[in-house]
Every structure is written in C-alpha cells, then in structure tokens.
C-alpha cells in the first residue's frame, strides 16, 4: 500500500486494517515526514530508494525548466516491480475520483496535471500489468469511488494521525525552502485540505492541526477563489473539484462557528448569490461512484465502513 504522508493513504491503510487485510506500508524516496507516518501505522514497512540523475540538476544550471512528471505513474511502476519480486498480489494506491478532473483553462479546455492519478491511467495501467506482467497482480486505487470530501469525512473519524500527517506539497519540494511546520498555510493543498476537513471535524481540532484558521485570513482570498473557480481556474495541484469546494464553503456558511470567519462571510455575500442552491449540497458529493478496479469482495467489506 503506497503511503504519501497525507490523509488519503492513511484512510486506505486504516480501511484495509479494519477489513483484516495484511498490508505492507510502502513509500519511495527519503521523506522523513512519510517515514514518521508509516511508522505511526504500526504496520510492516518497505522503503524503496529512488535517486534522481545528477544530469537533471546540471540541466537546471544550464537554464532548463523543471517540468511536472507523472510521478504517480513512475511510483506505480516501481511498486509493481517490488510486488513481483516479493510475490505480492496487490498494489494499492489512494487516488480519489476527483483526481480524474482537471482545470478548465479559458481558450484551451481541460488540463489535468495529475492525469496519472486519474481513472483513465489507473484502468490502462492496471490492464497492462495483468496482460503483460502478472495476470494475478491487481493494481488499483482503494479510494477511486470516493470524492475528496468523502475521503475527508473518513479521515476525520479518528485523530490518531493529526500530529503526523501533511498534504502540504512544500514538504516534498526537491529544491527550495520547506515549511518549518508540517503545513505552510499558503499553498493550494493547505487551502483545500483545511476547507475539505472543516465540515467534518470540530473547529478547534482543525485549527490545532494547521496552527491557525486559514478561513479567517483575508490574504488567503485569492487562493480560495481559485479553488472555488471564482474568477480563476482550479490550481495545478492535487485538490478537489470546484463543486466540492463550493459545497464545503456553503456548508460552513450555515454553521454558527464558521459563518463569521472573513472568507466564509465573503463567500456568503459575494459568491454564493451567483450560484444555484441545489449545486451547493454536500450530500450528493459523498455518494460512491461505480467506476473502480477494487476486487468485488473487498469493496463490499469496505463500502459499509466508508458509509458509516
């Protein structure tokens, strides 16, 4: 089971544990944050080394730009190799259905920078593995039927990982500064995870995780506008769909403990009146999708746990 240090993989790990499935928590690279999360699970672990070619950094020095590589595809291939070598029959990732939807760019159309986290890649790669590598090796995402909000709801059921997890991508930059704390509080991932968790956990707990209330800071307005697809497009980050952000914000606007925060109040006054009320309901976004590669018997056991 791949672990990335964020909420998604921890939801998968605990779901499999509750279903009685033996698992090895696996990560690629040397992140100490991921190691701490993996050790926190108390399960067997596997850390696979991956070293970037020094020529890449030489190209940087010569002026070459860094590009976004399909890192989930790379890691999927590495973990399939590890599974074959170790005689394991399943490789499990934690990509939710929201990953299949990109950013809507004016004049261009949809651009999905996280395509290798989406359903099209999972289906194609999983079929390739079974046709050409090992017929009995299942590759799938355990969270594919779930939206980001459904994953957040599941994560909020336990505080066991509150002091260990982080979805902030600045923790994983190869070059440049990393946040002193686990959450930088200003990137799209921090913005979205805070918003996604807010409807499902006590405010005091969420603020304790992040160290501050991101929704009561007017300087974060531009970042949240992008998540809401208000006068901007969804960021090129692994965040939920615009409709999920809008529904989460509308939910908070109706809650006494959130509605006075400056960005929630701004949403209620400026953005919500332009939206159809029936598109702001959170419940329809928590319904499971039927498109996934999870083995049927396992999904039946997991489904009840996710729905509870």
Language-model features: locations:
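Nucleotide-activated chemistry modules centered on ATP-dependent adenylation/adenylyltransferase
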Residues: 7-308
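Short, glycine-rich nucleotide/cofactor-binding loops
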Residues: 1-7
């Amino acid at each position: 089971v791949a672990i990335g240090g964020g909420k998604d993989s921890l939801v998968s790990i605990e779901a499999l544990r509750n279903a009685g499935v033996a698992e090895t928590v696996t990560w690629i690279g040397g992140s100490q944050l991921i190691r701490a999360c993996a050790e926190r699970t108390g399960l067997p672990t596997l850390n696979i080394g991956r070293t970037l070619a020094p020529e890449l950094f030489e190209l940087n020095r010569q002026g070459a730009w860094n590009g976004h590589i399909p890192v989930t595809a790379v890691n999927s291939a590495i973990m399939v190799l590890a599974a074959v070598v170790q005689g394991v029959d399943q490789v499990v990732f934690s990509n939710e259905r929201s990953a299949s939807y990109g950013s809507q760019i004016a004049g261009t159309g949809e651009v999905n920078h996280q395509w290798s986290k989406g359903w099209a890649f999972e289906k194609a790669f999983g079929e390739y593995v079974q046709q050409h590598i090992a017929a009995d090796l299942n590759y799938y995402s355990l969270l594919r039927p779930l939206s980001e909000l459904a994953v957040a709801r599941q994560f909020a059921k336990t505080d066991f990982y509150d002091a260990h997890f982080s979805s902030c991508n600045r923790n994983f930059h190869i070059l440049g500064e990393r946040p002193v704390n686990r959450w930088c509080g200003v990137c799209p991932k921090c913005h979205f995870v805070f918003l996604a968790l807010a409807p499902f956990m006590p405010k005091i707990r969420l603020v304790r995780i992040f160290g501050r209330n991101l929704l009561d800071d007017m300087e974060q307005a531009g970042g949240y506008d992008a998540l809401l697809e208000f006068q901007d497009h969804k960021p090129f980050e692994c965040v939920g769909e615009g409709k999920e952000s809008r529904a989460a914000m509308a939910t908070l606007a109706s809650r006494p403990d959130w509605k006075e925060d400056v960005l929630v109040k701004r949403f209620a006054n400026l953005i919500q009146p332009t939206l159809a009320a029936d598109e702001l309901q959170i419940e329809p976004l928590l319904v499971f999708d039927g498109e996934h590669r999870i083995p049927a018997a396992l999904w039946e056991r997991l489904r009840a746990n996710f729905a509870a």
